[in-house]
Structure formats: C-alpha cells, structure tokens
Amino acid sequence: MARNDLQGSLDLLVLKTLSQMEELHGYGIVLHIQRASDELLSVEEGSLYPALHRMEMSGWIRSEWKVTDTSRKAKYYRLTPAGQKELQSAEKSFEQLVKGIRAILRYA
C-alpha cells in the first residue's frame, strides 16, 4: 500500500495542479509544480508524459490540442469528474502515508 502511495505522488501532484489551474499543457504542469513547491519539487518530462497518458486512459484527465500563446501546438490537459474523485482519494491516502511516516520518525 505505501509503495503505491509513493509511486502515486506524481499523479497526486498533477491532479492537484489541474484542479487549481483548470487546464495546462505538460510544460505548464512542470512549471506549476516547481513554483508551487518553492522549487523543492521537480518533475522530469520523461516521467510526466507517460503518467499523463496513463491518467487519460484511466479517465481522470482529458486532453485537447490547442495553440499556445507563442503560436505553437500543445496538448492541454483538464481534470474530469472521475479525476476529481481520484484526487480526493489520493489526498486521503497521502495524508495516511504522511501520518505513518511521522509516527515512525517520532518513534525512532
């Protein structure tokens, strides 16, 4: 269970970002996570795009090709109602994981 929670951290970060920003392209998601974490977290694009594809296949996000402000085509991602439910579940699971880690750190 904890291993899945740790591996699901990227999903949680992406879903939370899309819940706050409505829609973003992949690089925008990377930048938002970096800025929102005060540069403590960074997401490699090589990890992000497979995760976005998997989340889209799961129905948690949907995508649409659009033209950016710099006149380039980019795939923009948006949270779905199923993604909102998954976000709520992932937040609860993550809080439980953090609670467990805190308990161990206090014990040690």
Model-derived segments and their meaning:
Residues E56-K73, R78:
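Beta-hairpin "wing" of winged helix-turn-helix
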Residues L48-M55:
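Basic amphipathic alpha-helical segments that dock to polyanions
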Residues M1-N4, W65-K66:
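Short beta-strand/turn micro-motifs at beta-sheet edges
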Residues N4-S47:
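N-terminal helix-turn-helix DNA-binding core of bacterial DNA-binding proteins
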